[in-house]
Regions:
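Activation segment/activation loop of eukaryotic-type protein kinase catalytic domains
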Residues: 40-78
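A conserved short helix/loop substructure at the end of the activation segment
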Residues: 163-174
């Protein structure tokens, strides 16, 4: 996004997130599982025009999606061959939550932390480095990431904590509602529009 849309702010990123969520909702209504959900398979024309590409890998009925990435795959499915099991809507929602997280903290995977290893090694609930309760931060990445996290709405942080720290399933509508609320707050001037904080 940085090169293609250099003038974008948080409203643009949040609207992209909302349109991806709506796209997933529409497909799920027809029992179509995306399976291989990742940024490379999403084409963004502008914040309101978003397309899913490489749709030949969609899981339809008993035909599994045979490809994927660890980062967008729930931990319980790590080690399995993608073509040997059928994914669920919950698998798509986990991948979607990861994508939305990376839009809110631009480019940063949820389990990335200071001193961490590979993406696959990092993907454990106890490694989620952002503050979810009184326990505080846990080796959060250096730089602006703690600041950005601290300025996200409570509802959205709660959803990320449920998915990445507590390993819980969430409803698609809950993340959609949280993003819609965030857009409203941004448009009303209740939240900063900065994508990244230049100084802490």
């Amino acid at each position: 996004f940085k090169n293609k849309f250099p003038n974008w702010n948080r409203i643009h990123l949040t609207k992209v997130a909302l349109n991806i969520i709506k796209m997933v909702q529409d497909l799920h209504e027809y029992n179509i599982i995306i399976g291989d959900m990742n940024p490379n398979n999403i084409l963004v024309q502008d914040e309101n025009t978003v397309f899913m590409i490489d749709t030949d890998s969609f899981q339809i009925e008993e035909y599994p999606c045979s490809v994927g990435f660890n980062l967008y795959t729930r931990k319980i499915n790590h080690g399995k061959r993608y073509d040997e099991y059928l994914r669920t809507k919950d698998d798509d929602i986990f991948a979607l939550a990861t994508l939305v997280f990376q839009l809110m903290l631009p480019g940063k995977p949820p389990y990335s932390y200071s001193g961490g290893g590979t993406e696959k090694e990092n993907m454990k609930p106890e490694n989620f480095p952002y503050k979810c309760d009184k326990s505080g931060y846990n080796n959060a990445p250096d730089g602006q990431w703690v600041y950005i996290w601290s300025h996200l709405p409570f509802k959205l942080k709660e959803i990320f904590c449920q998915v990445f720290r507590k390993n819980l399933k969430i409803e698609l509508n809950s993340i959609k509602n949280a993003i819609e609320d965030y857009i409203y707050q941004l448009e009303q001037g209740h939240q900063t529009l900065e994508k990244k904080k230049k100084t802490f």
